[in-house]
Amino acid sequence: MELKELEYIVAVAEEQSISKAADRLYLAQSSLSQYVSRYEAELGVKLFRRTSGGVRTTAAGDLFLKNARQMLLQYHQVRQQLTDLDAPMEGQIHFGISTFRGSYLFPKAMHLFRQESPTVDVVLHEHDSIYLQRKIAAGELDLALVAFREDQWENQGKFLMKDEVLLVANRDSPVMEYVREGGGGPDRPWVELSEIGHLDFLLSSRSAMLGSIAQKQFDDLGIHPKFVCGTQTASMSAALARRGVGISFTYRSCIEESRDVIYLSIGKSRCYVNLALIYPQEGYRSRAIRAFENAICRVLASEVF
């Protein structure tokens, strides 16, 4: 079995669908299905259970998957080390960032990095911070920019900055009746969350970082707000809020300024997340990875939040 074939098995397991994995790998679905069947025949065990909803790993598949990921990680690290010996900087970086934050920060970092390191490819993995932490722990990414709740921060990775969690709404929203300025509060308009719990809210999934922060804020106050629309992504929630559908949570680093939109701090003490770059604990950080990390840090340092 070749290393690329290990990647096929990993892709099928992650996508839980042969058709989706085939799209990801740029293979014909029939070819990938034949590959999987052949591997299973060679090994003498079933790696996947076929169901009406896709494929799921068996116990044997879980064991195979764990070892396949380790082998791919080791191969990738050895290649990076060999590349770093005396060759020009090149290779491939697997970088993770949330789609929401990535749409604002990644293009700037990538533009800067490509100017300085045109022979290095960056493979982008867009997921929420919670999922990216798991991918890093499994050694499946080289680097990820993630957010940690303040109560979860334990000096994990390289701290970059605090990013404020804000509320976003259209200026025609009834939340405007509760907006305060000054009074010992933040340097921007702010509201007490306890006073607006009866208004319409939009929330992203609790499994995502911003969704989990919002739910914790409400839970701590014993509030059960009315959710007018549940979405899977923070970007969709914010977009709906800007159009006046309800109130949503967003990050200061992801503000889209508009005369019709207001961004509000949450309470006098505000709410923050810690942004950090994280890496596999035992991973090798190549020159290319370090250079890309530097590009991200320079972009963040140039931004005014």
Each language-model region and where it sits:
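Central regulatory/effector-binding core of bacterial HTH transcription factors
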Residues: 90-153, 230-231
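A late-sequence structural motif
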Residues: 105, 263-305
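Beta-alpha-beta core module
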Residues: 153-159, 163, 191, 235-282
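Hydrophobic hinge/microswitch elements
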Residues: 128-132, 137-140, 146-147, 207-264
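A short LG(V/I)-centered, amphipathic sequence patch enriched
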Residues: 40-59
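Secondary-structure junction motif
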Residues: 178-179, 183-221, 285-289, 293, ...
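Residues within helix-turn-helix
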Residues: 18-21, 30, 37, 133, ...
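Short helix-boundary/capping micro-motifs
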Residues: 10-28
